[in-house]
C-alpha cells in the first residue's frame, strides 16, 4: 500500500510551497504520481475535493493570512468583479481568484476564463455583445500611433490606461461614426485656455455642491480632519494637506480637502493655522472650533491647534515606539542599517531582475516600510546571500535573527493597516492594538537575543510614548464598540461623564459614586458647537514620564490567549462575548446604563456602524454620539499617500 497523508495535511503542505507559485493541481499531481503518496479522503467527486481546497483558501483570507487585490489586469468584463488573491508577501496566489459579489474563491488555471464566465455572478454581467472585433493589423497601427503620441508629447506610457483617456477615445469613435473621416481635427479639439476655464468652472461647481455638506457636518459637530505636512526636498518647499471625515446616513465619508503650499514661509503655528483656516474657508466654513483634528506630535501643529480638540496620530505614535526601540538596541539598529545597505547595493548594481521578488526600500516617513524592506530580503534570502558572497559584502546579522524580527513585526504590520483605514472605524481599535502589542511582546524563555531585546524595548516605549498619550476620546470610542463596552471597568466612570458632556440633548442620568473622589457631573451644554474634553487632556506635556507605576501596566482589556488567530475580530478581541443579553432585571433611566448592561456578541463579520444603525431607536442619543466618535480616524497616515 502506498504511503498516505490526510487531506488537511495535504492542504497545509500545499500552502507551505505555494510561496513559489505552485498551482493546486500541479502540486497534487506531483505528490500523487512522482512521490507515490495517496491522499486520504472519503470517495468524493472532483468538485467536492476542489470545494475543500477553495474553503481552505477562503479561511486564509478570512483570518488575514491572504488578502484580496484591488483589480485583476484583464480586458474581459468578468474582471470587474473577480480579482487576484495575494499571499503574505503580497505576491499573487496562482490558481485561485476571489469573487467580490458572492465572496467565493474560484479556481483559475492557465489563463482560461471559460469556467469563470459560467460563474453565476459573471452570468449577470452586461456583456458588450455588439462590439466589433478589431483586426490584428489595426491593433498594430494603434500601438504605433499610441507610441508616437507618448513620445512626441512626452506622456507616460500608463496614460493609455487612464479612464479619462478611454472615454475620450470612445467619444472620438462616436464622432467618426457620425461624420466619417472628413472632420477637421483642429476644429474639434478645444483651445488650452478653453480647457483651463472649463476645468475651473467644473471645480467651482463641484466645490459648491460639497460645501454645504461640509459646513453642515462642521456645524453639527460631526466633522473631523487630519493634518499633515510634507517637504519637497528638491525645492525645499513645505506643503500642508488636510483630509475631511464625517458620517452621513450611517456611512463614513472622507475626502481630501486640499493641499496648500506654505509659499516658502516658515512653518510656524500662526502660518499653519492660517493655512488650515484658509482651506476650510474655501468651503464656506469660517469657524473650525467644532472640528476634531488628528495630527502628529509636532510642536508647531500642536501650538496651532491648541484651541481645538486634537488627537495624536496612532500610526505616528506606533512608528515612534518602533523607531525608538530599534535605535536603543545596537543589535537591532545594525540589522536595519545592513538591510538598507543590501537594498542600495542591489539597486545600484542592477541586480533586482535576478531576484524572485523586488527588494523594498525604506521610507523615512513611513516606519512600517522598514518591515517591508526586511521581509523582502528574507523572502529572497537565498539569492541575496549568494549576491553578498560574490561581492564579498559583510552584514551584521544572519537569517535566523532577521526572521525572528520579521515574525514579530508581521503582526505590527496588521495593526498599522487597521489603524490607517478610513473606510471603516479605526479609532475604536487603538486600545485593542495596544493590548495586542503588549500580548505579542510578552517575554518567552525560548526567544533569541534579538527577539528578546526587541520585545523588551517595545514594552517600555509603548508605555512611555503611546499609552501616555491616550485621550478620553480613544477610551470612549472603544467603549462605544458594543462587544467591548464592559472591558474598561477602571475607566467607566470617566467615560460616562465624558459621554454625557458630549451628548447634545438632555438625558436623565444619575451617578451613584462609591469612590471617595467624586468628579463633577458636567451640565448639558446649551450650544452644540463646543465639544470639549472635561476630564482628561488629550496630549500630556510630559509624555516621557508616566505618572505612577500603575499607569505603566497593560490596560488588561483581554485575557491571554494562544496565537492561533481565526479572524480579524479575534485578532483584536481574543475573547469576546458570545451570547447576547438584551433582557435586564431592572429598567435603567438612561441609555448609557442600559447600553453598559447589554452584552453584544462579537460575530466574525461584526460591523459596528451597522449595529448602531440597527439599534438607533433603542439608543437614539448614544447612537449619534457613537457615529460622531467612530467617524474620527485613528491616524493621519492616509494623507501621506497624497504626497509623492
Swiss-Prot record:
Top-level taxon of the source organism: Eukaryota
Gene Ontology molecular function, alphabetical: DNA binding; protein dimerization activity; zinc ion binding
Sequence repeats: 521-523, 524-526, 527-529, 530-532, 533-535, 536-538, 539-541, 542-544, 545-547, 548-550
GO cellular component terms attached to this protein's record: nucleus
Zinc fingers classed as BED-type: ranges: 73-131
InterPro entries to which the protein is assigned, alphabetical: HATC_C_dom, Hermes_transposase_DNA-db, RNaseH-like_sf, Vacuolar_transposase_reg, Znf_BED
Pfam families named among the record's database cross-references: DBD_Tnp_Hermes, Dimer_Tnp_hAT
Region called 10 X 3 AA tandem repeats of T-P-E, residue ranges: 521-550
Keywords: DNA integration, DNA recombination, DNA-binding, Metal-binding, Nucleus, Repeat, Transposable element, Zinc, Zinc-finger
Region ranges (Disordered): 514-560
Localization of this protein: Nucleus
Primary subcellular site in the record, as a coarse category: nucleus
GO biological process: DNA integration; DNA recombination
Known role: Essential for hobo transposase activity.
Protein's recorded name: Transposable element Hobo transposase
Originating species: Drosophila melanogaster (Fruit fly)
Amino acid at each position: 500500500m502506498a504511503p498516505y497523508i490526510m487531506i488537511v495535511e495535504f492542504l497545509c503542505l500545499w500552502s507551505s510551497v505555494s510561496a513559489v507559485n505552485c498551482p493546486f493541481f500541479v502540486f497534487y499531481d506531483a505528490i500523487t504520481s512522482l512521490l507515490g503518496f495517496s491522499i486520504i479522503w472519503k470517495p468524493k467527486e472532483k468538485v467536492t475535493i476542489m470545494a475543500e481546497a477553495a474553503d481552505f483558501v477562503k479561511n486564509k483570507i478570512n483570518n488575514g493570512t491572504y488578502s484580496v487585490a484591488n483589480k485583476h489586469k484583464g480586458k474581459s468584463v468578468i474582471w470587474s468583479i473577480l480579482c487576484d488573491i495575494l499571499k503574505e508577501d503580497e505576491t499573487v496566489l496562482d490558481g485561485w481568484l476571489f469573487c467580490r459579489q458572492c465572496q467565493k474563491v474560484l479556481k483559475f488555471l492557465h489563463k482560461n476564463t471559460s469556467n469563470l464566465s459560467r460563474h453565476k455572478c459573471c452570468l449577470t454581467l452586461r456583456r458588450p455583445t455588439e462590439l466589433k472585433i478589431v483586426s490584428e493589423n489595426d491593433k498594430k497601427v494603434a500601438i504605433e500611433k499610441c507610441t508616437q503620441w507618448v513620445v512626441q508629447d512626452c506622456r507616460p506610457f500608463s496614460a493609455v490606461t487612464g479612464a479619462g483617456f478611454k472615454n475620450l477615445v470612445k467619444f472620438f469613435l462616436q464622432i467618426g461614426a457620425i461624420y466619417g473621416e472628413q472632420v477637421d481635427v483642429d476644429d474639434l479639439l478645444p483651445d488650452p485656455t478653453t480647457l483651463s476655464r472649463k476645468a475651473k468652472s467644473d471645480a467651482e461647481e463641484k466645490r459648491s455642491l460639497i460645501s454645504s455638506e461640509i459646513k453642515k457636518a462642521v456645524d453639527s459637530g460631526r466633522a473631523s480632519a487630519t493634518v499633515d505636512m510634507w517637504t519637497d526636498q528638491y525645492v525645499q518647499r513645505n506643503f500642508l494637506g488636510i483630509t475631511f471625515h464625517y458620517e452621513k446616513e450611517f456611512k463614513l465619508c472622507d475626502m481630501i480637502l486640499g493641499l496648500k503650499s506654505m509659499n516658502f514661509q516658515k512653518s510656524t503655528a500662526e502660518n499653519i493655522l492660517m493655512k488650515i483656516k484658509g482651506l476650510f474657508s474655501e468651503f464656506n466654513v469660517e469657524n473650525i472650533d467644532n472640528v476634531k483634528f488628528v495630527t502628529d506630535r509636532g510642536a508647531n501643529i500642536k501650538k496651532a491647534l491648541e484651541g481645538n480638540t486634537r488627537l495624536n496620530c496612532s500610526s505616528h505614535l506606533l512608528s515612534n515606539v518602533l523607531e525608538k526601540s530599534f535605535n536603543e538596541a545596537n543589535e537591532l539598529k545594525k540589522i536595519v542599517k545592513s538591510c538598507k545597505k543590501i537594498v542600495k547595493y542591489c539597486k545600484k548594481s542592477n541586480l533586482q531582475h535576478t531576484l524572485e521578488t523586488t527588494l523594498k526600500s525604506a521610507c523615512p516617513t513611513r516606519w512600517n516600510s522598514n518591515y517591508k524592506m526586511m521581509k523582502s530580503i528574507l523572502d529572497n534570502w537565498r539569492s541575496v546571500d549568494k549576491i553578498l558572497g560574490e561581492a564579498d559584502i559583510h552584514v551584521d546579522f544572519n537569517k535566523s535573527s532577521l526572521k525572528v524580527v520579521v515574525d514579530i513585526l508581521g503582526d505590527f504590520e496588521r495593526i498599522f493597516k487597521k489603524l490607517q483605514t478610513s473606510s471603516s472605524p479605526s479609532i475604536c481599535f487603538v486600545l485593542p492594538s495596544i493590548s495586542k502589542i503588549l500580548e505579542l511582546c510578552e517575554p518567552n524563555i525560548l526567544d533569541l537575543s534579538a527577539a528578546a531585546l526587541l520585545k523588551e524595548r517595545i514594552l517600555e516605549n509603548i508605555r512611555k510614548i503611546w499609552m501616555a498619550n491616550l485621550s478620553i476620546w480613544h477610551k470612549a470610542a472603544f467603549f462605544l464598540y458594543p462587544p467591548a463596552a464592559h472591558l474598561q471597568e477602571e475607566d467607566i466612570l470617566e467615560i460616562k461623564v465624558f459621554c454625557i458632556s458630549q451628548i447634545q440633548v438632555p438625558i436623565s442620568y444619575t451617578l451613584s459614586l462609591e469612590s471617595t473622589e467624586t468628579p463633577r457631573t458636567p451640565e448639558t451644554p446649551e450650544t452644540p458647537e463646543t465639544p470639549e474634553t472635561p476630564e482628561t487632556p488629550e496630549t500630556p506635556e510630559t509624555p516621557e514620564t508616566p505618572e505612577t507605576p500603575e499607569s505603566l501596566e497593560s490596560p488588561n482589556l483581554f485575557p491571554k490567549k494562544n496565537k492561533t488567530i481565526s479572524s480579524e475580530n479575534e485578532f483584536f478581541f481574543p475573547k469576546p462575548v458570545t451570547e447576547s443579553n438584551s433582557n435586564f432585571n431592572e429598567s435603567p433611566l438612561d441609555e448609557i446604563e442600559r447600553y453598559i448592561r447589554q452584552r453584544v456578541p462579537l460575530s466574525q463579520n461584526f460591523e459596528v456602524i451597522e449595529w448602531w444603525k440597527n439599534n438607533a431607536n433603542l439608543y437614539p442619543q448614544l447612537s449619534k454620539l457613537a457615529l460622531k466618535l467612530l467617524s474620527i480616524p485613528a491616524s493621519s497616515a492616509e494623507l501621506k499617500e497624497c504626497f509623492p
